[in-house]
Amino acid sequence: MSISYFMKKIVILGSTGSIGTSTLSVITHNPDKYQVFALVGGRNVELMFQQCLTFQPSFAALDDDVAAKMLAEKLKAHQSQTTVLAGQQAICELAAHPEADMVMAAIVGAAGLLPTLSAVKAGKRVLLANKEALVTCGQLFIDAVRESQAQLLPVDSEHNAIFQSLPPEAQRQIGFCPLSELGISKIVLTGSGGPFRYTPLEQFEQITPAQAVAHPNWSMGKKISVDSATMMNKGLEYIEARWLFNASAEEMEVIIHPQSIIHSMVRYIDGSVIAQMGNPDMRTPIAETMAYPSRTVAGVEPLDFYQLNGLTFIEPDYQRYPCLKLAIDAFSAGQYATTAMNAANEIAVASFLDNKIKFTDIARLNQLVVSKLQPQKIHCIEDVLEVDKKARELSQSIILSFSHP
């Protein structure tokens, strides 16, 4: 039997999150193709417990020690054979485990950074859903991919759409493909514009967390939903796209597409535009990366063209979306700026969801942190973590000076 028919063993970093649960959904549609080798989460014991009973992984790991002990006890009571581990070191070791064929890197935030890098350095097939790996460690990350010859496949719907719209030569050179030599003129990132694209600007101060997490098209976690509302999500994706596709500022274009049917596009020098379309369901890009270069069932409804009420495109308004402009400018400023902005944004969004700051304070805080932090060169992961720490501390102190909503 050909090796291509062997079941692929997958490690899911962030299995209890939105991308993780969608990945497990794809696996349930392909039980003969994929085997869950390890599940990794934060502290959601109950969901991890259910996932372990359903998928019977060899390993499960939680970042939180107390949560891991609770999980181990619950699994033992159910005669589960899954070995439970705890802490960052164990998670990094699972990400690089010799038995793993592929690693879904879907831990949200800076917490996913080291495990994702571990998978890359081990030369794994890495299905990249963690934005921070490229936002905070762009050059270091791409250099590690090149050195280890890891296979990097983008899961984010936009980057996956771009990936699918590229020629095979570019797909084989993620991180260092020469766009112009391959006849590519522009990478076009699309975004819905979030739930407030038509809300009057004077009402932005009154936006509540409940309103901000109600995304019109996609089912996402709270943090990413707020990032979509501010378009910081698109800003982070802009930074990622520049690294993933080796694109200059002139080779990038951001367009608001409210229907989220076209997930992104690639312009070619002959005037062609190749777009990837589909229903807004993360299982499509997840399945594409898992099966690449083949295709597999994802459990997604086919796109019904007769139900579409037209496709529209709008130029981004930076007054409405200052976070998008900040991200574009931060890339030009350097790695320290994108790292600081990302850290500040994590604190800002958490504070907004906790009703500690206003919606408009998110962009305000991000801008203040980037402008106040001293520029510095990033040479290694320790430098990244240092900037991240400084930016978080600065963010917390600035928030104290904000008047509460």
Curated annotation (Swiss-Prot):
Any GO MF annotation of the entry: 1-deoxy-D-xylulose-5-phosphate reductoisomerase activity
Catalytic activity as recorded in UniProt: 2-C-methyl-D-erythritol 4-phosphate + NADP(+) = 1-deoxy-D-xylulose 5-phosphate + NADPH + H(+)
Database matches in InterPro entries: DXP_reductoisomerase (IPR003821), DXP_reductoisomerase_C (IPR013644), DXP_reductoisomerase_N (IPR013512), DXPR_C (IPR026877), DXPR_C_sf (IPR036169), NAD(P)-bd_dom_sf (IPR036291)
Pathway(s) per entry: Isoprenoid biosynthesis; isopentenyl diphosphate biosynthesis via DXP pathway; isopentenyl diphosphate from 1-deoxy-D-xylulose 5-phosphate: step 1/6
Residues engaged in binding NADPH: 16-19, 42-44, 130, 132, 221
Binding site for 1-deoxy-D-xylulose 5-phosphate: 131, 157-158, 192, 215, 228, 233-234, 237
Record keywords: Isoprene biosynthesis, Manganese, Metal-binding, NADP, Oxidoreductase
Protein residues bound to Mn(2+): 156, 158, 237
Single GO biological process annotation from the record: isopentenyl diphosphate biosynthetic process, methylerythritol 4-phosphate pathway involved in terpenoid biosynthetic process
Family membership noted in the UniProt record: Belongs to the DXR family.
Cofactor: Mg(2+); Mn(2+)
Top-level lineage group: Bacteria
Biological source species: Pasteurella multocida (strain Pm70)
Gene that this sequence comes from: dxr
Function: Catalyzes the NADPH-dependent rearrangement and reduction of 1-deoxy-D-xylulose-5-phosphate (DXP) to 2-C-methyl-D-erythritol 4-phosphate (MEP).
HAMAP family listed in its UniProt record: DXP_reductoisom
KW S-adenosyl-L-methionine (keyword) present: no
Enzyme type, top EC level: oxidoreductase
Protein name, as recorded: 1-deoxy-D-xylulose 5-phosphate reductoisomerase
EC number: 1.1.1.267
